Amino acid sequence: MLKFRTVHGGLRLLGIRRTSTAPAASPNVRRLEYKPIKKVMVANRGEIAIRVFRACTELGIRTVAIYSEQDTGQMHRQKADEAYLIGRGLAPVQAYLHIPDIIKVAKENNVDAVHPGYGFLSERADFAQACQDAGVRFIGPSPEVVRKMGDKVEARAIAIAAGVPVVPGTDAPITSLHEAHEFSNTYGFPIIFKAAYGGGGRGMRVVHSYEELEENYTRAYSEALAAFGNGALFVEKFIEKPRHIEVQILGDQYGNILHLYERDCSIQRRHQKVVEIAPAAHLDPQLRTRLTSDSVKLAKQVGYENAGTVEFLVDRHGKHYFIEVNSRLQVEHTVTEEITDVDLVHAQIHVAEGRSLPDLGLRQENIRINGCAIQCRVTTEDPARSFQPDTGRIEVFRSGEGMGIRLDNASAFQGAVISPHYDSLLVKVIAHGKDHPTAATKMSRALAEFRVRGVKTNIAFLQNVLNNQQFLAGTVDTQFIDENPELFQLRPAQNRAQKLLHYLGHVMVNGPTTPIPVKASPSPTDPVVPAVPIGPPPAGFRDILLREGPEGFARAVRNHPGLLLMDTTFRDAHQSLLATRVRTHDLKKIAPYVAHNFSKLFSMENWGGATFDVAMRFLYECPWRRLQELRELIPNIPFQMLLRGANAVGYTNYPDNVVFKFCEVAKENGMDVFRVFDSLNYLPNMLLGMEAAGSAGGVVEAAISYTGDVADPSRTKYSLQYYMGLAEELVRAGTHILCIKDMAGLLKPTACTMLVSSLRDRFPDLPLHIHTHDTSGAGVAAMLACAQAGADVVDVAADSMSGMTSQPSMGALVACTRGTPLDTEVPMERVFDYSEYWEGARGLYAAFDCTATMKSGNSDVYENEIPGGQYTNLHFQAHSMGLGSKFKEVKKAYVEANQMLGDLIKVTPSSKIVGDLAQFMVQNGLSRAEAEAQAEELSFPRSVVEFLQGYIGVPHGGFPEPFRSKVLKDLPRVEGRPGASLPPLDLQALEKELVDRHGEEVTPEDVLSAAMYPDVFAHFKDFTATFGPLDSLNTRLFLQGPKIAEEFEVELERGKTLHIKALAVSDLNRAGQRQVFFELNGQLRSILVKDTQAMKEMHFHPKALKDVKGQIGAPMPGKVIDIKVVAGAKVAKGQPLCVLSAMKMETVVTSPMEGTVRKVHVTKDMTLEGDDLILEIE
């Protein structure tokens, strides 16, 4: 049995094969001594270093890596057998340009040969010479050839001598801006600056006019100096809309030169290649022959050896121009390898060992094109921000693989840190197929499989390129990206799982994201969802509405023999008891049960009112999505919303077109019945809302807000005659249904009988709907009295969500009417199950439950007339401020405030105005008499002042005088309907503004949310962009996050469920962050979460606030290399302010406005993160 010695760190056994299988020298060629290479150092980093290491390992060659201090954690140093630090104390790029250190490492570690990779020193003749002088082989051309080809001006002269056509340009590097001016005068614009000692797009700048000349010259020089250690430039005529075709060549030390056909590198931005294709599609065979023969001719002219690339521009007429020779391996060498089956790195190494191309079996006649290959460079750049590099920690990395896919990468793994110091390349994806469309399909599929989280990438942009018809046809040129702006219509990645982990981590570190009024944890048990039968739910009143329209629906309601119920559990009940905090997640769970078991309901109140803004403000949910999802789950029961007349679902007046559009879109999303009211019963506001709802095709239910007591002869302001007169106006305006909206629960049975019977007698064919609250405890009796007096519909809530400030009990009404002519036909057993679910669900909202401070309703509501939801809120506020014992004083002040304002109808927003004034009086220790007497000197709440100005309408009986005049003094007064004087809102302009801020995925619903609540909507969008679809989390997780070791599932959508386990939270790091560890679908995930409390005690550079005009933030992470202005300087729009450098690319930050620099927050050489504040302009 053969025994082999242990191999340490490399596959040296393969060396046996290498030495024993070397072919014999050709008898016709003078042989050089064959010197096997045993140890290779790659003087580079990243994926190209790994590419060479892999080739060496396959050949049994030991590998050596070098790395800078900034690259300590990079993968390339781990892929080598040995790795050594270079450039200690040097800048990141300079470390890889420090020839003495690199040579020292090579000599000290017995390196036979150095592979330069690409970039850095790969085209530096002095480096090739230094290797040669040190007795280390340079895997590339000779130093002299590197010098000639690296000097693009000399290369150009050689091309001319070889008879290869060239673009008009300077004969030598220019040394001044004056020379650039002279060239422009001779050849005209456009021209292009190019770095004389490197490529890759650095140091390249196209200039279209004299005005651009100086800035672009300066930037090109600076970039070339930073990237290649030499800022020399040459200038040439810029050929517009050419194809960029390059030919791969390979030579040996015996004068043999061959080509491996061409690559099309036309898809570029900033002269840097993005997608490369081999072979070039639809290339004329004669042009291909000219390109390849000229490339070989040029290589022979200089005695080229090893791998290289000859680059050409091909104009629209098929004429080609030599650009340059890259005397190194190219980034895109991979596509050539795929179509020719030639390993170029193997060939490079063998040539450096002294082997000839024929020895390697490489003869021109044997090189054939096999199919097509495409390479996409996946980078950490943001196409939406002009491809600005992004930096940070990769939280998730999952690549696309499979048949026909090759990946060349380096530090593309979870936990890798992308720094601003080097190139933004993350991974090269190479697809190979039988033809161009097949390769494009494979590439598109592979990119779709990628998941990169934590840093932005250009994947969405690449996918757009691959789906572009011009690209698929193969007819692209270097203007392809510029001429196809639709490539930048990027479909954002959903990234839902990672965003949810960020949210859960944030809550685990910082606590709840929504204000918690009471320290009470959610119930540990989930509510029990009753079983639901399979199949569609039974027909309900919505089927009649869809079939017969609003008029037919109203007739069916009026002709129904028994009492109909509207369930408020999905809106007003939880607004009254749970601070409007019930989430869509819990509504959706019980929704199918409601659809199947409560089809006899008149409607469900589930939208509008306070739920609209609270959904966005505190629950981070889209109210429109709630409507859409509930509509899908409950197709048979009409939905009802609360529309505040001209206020829609807001607290102020909006232009008429906003209200009309809102109703239109609400109807399109599934809303059926619009209960239109006005907080002052101000008829013009109500008529506008009714018209908007009616024109949208909805059922119009005009609601008269009730206050006072029609059965009390002493209460004359809001008498029976007042309500009957108002009802006449609303019926005349065409309401389909008439509603009495008793917000405080003031309707007593006697008053119910008087009011409802009078309305029934006057409007025998009109459906009557009564809404109340049970604050006094008389709600069930009142609703029974209404039903007996002729009401068609009364409001109820699930038993466990009824009573107190909510609606009367559903079960009580069902039981009391059972077996009578008013029978609701609702099964009691279903009511019990429904109530049981809500009893469990209510426990999840313990922190918001009114019973934390309020143990019962109170009949004093007949005196203070506080609406149900507001009663709960005021009670909460009083207790939270330690004034629980003084709640009686708050209620007394409420009564006085109401009288000061003229005895208002109290419902949002008028109830809030009364409440604000009451709290103002309590906080300042004012009685009514004192407040009225000092009215001219006091600074009343804004809501009170605006009410007195007339901004929400005119109250019944007019404004209180002289109180109004004392408060307003010289302030303007609104005459008539407030919204009538408002100009129409430009909804299209608003949509564009939202798209500019939030991206293309802006919907008509978003536009209306922003129109109603601009600040709330903006925060909601920013929050969910960071933390994802939070309505998919259960309520316990949403409020308090998971416990360590807790396992749970999150259903993102049907068929997509995440299995998550919380593992650990780390200690605080120096950046004020904690690392939170999870297991997601069996894989470890970790995220960094800022500890907001700890960060208050730490100093960080301020961020630019997007909403503050004049605050200029860093568009990308990077280093400040130049500051163009000082504090006090006048700046024009577009004027350069400073220059940032990141990933060897410089970005000029320009002024977005004209103004004066107020303060500069950065200094030269300062390193910035994205959005760090640079300066302020005023």
From Swiss-Prot:
Domain Biotin carboxylation residue range list: 36-486
Residues with the N6-biotinyllysine modification: K1144
EC number, as in UniProt: 6.4.1.1
Cofactor note: Binds 1 Mn(2+) ion per subunit.
Pathway: Carbohydrate biosynthesis; gluconeogenesis
GO molecular function: ATP binding; biotin binding; identical protein binding; metal ion binding; pyruvate carboxylase activity
Domain Pyruvate carboxyltransferase: 563-832
Residues modified as N6-carboxylysine: K741
Cofactor(s) listed: biotin; Mn(2+)
Domain of life from the UniProt record: Eukaryota
Transit peptide: 1-20
Residues with the N6-succinyllysine modification: K79, K442
Active site per UniProt: R328
Annotated compartments: Mitochondrion matrix
UniProtKB keywords: Acetylation, ATP-binding, Biotin, Disease variant, Gluconeogenesis, Ligase, Lipid biosynthesis, Lipid metabolism, Manganese, Metal-binding, Mitochondrion, Multifunctional enzyme, Nucleotide-binding, Phosphoprotein, Pyruvate, Transit peptide
Binding site for ATP: K152, E236, H271
TM segment ranges: none
PTM annotation, UniProt: Acetylation of Lys-748 might play a role in catalytic activity regulation.
Main location class: mitochondrion
Effect caused by changing M743I: In PC deficiency; mild
Binding site for Mn(2+): D572, K741, H771, H773
Residues recorded as bearing Phosphothreonine in the entry: T1003
Disease: Pyruvate carboxylase deficiency: Leads to lactic acidosis, intellectual disability and death. It occurs in three forms: mild or type A, severe neonatal or type B, and a very mild lacticacidemia.
Subunit note: Homotetramer. Interacts (via the biotin carboxylation domain) with SIRT4.
Designated name of the protein: Pyruvate carboxylase, mitochondrial
Organism: Homo sapiens
Gene: PC
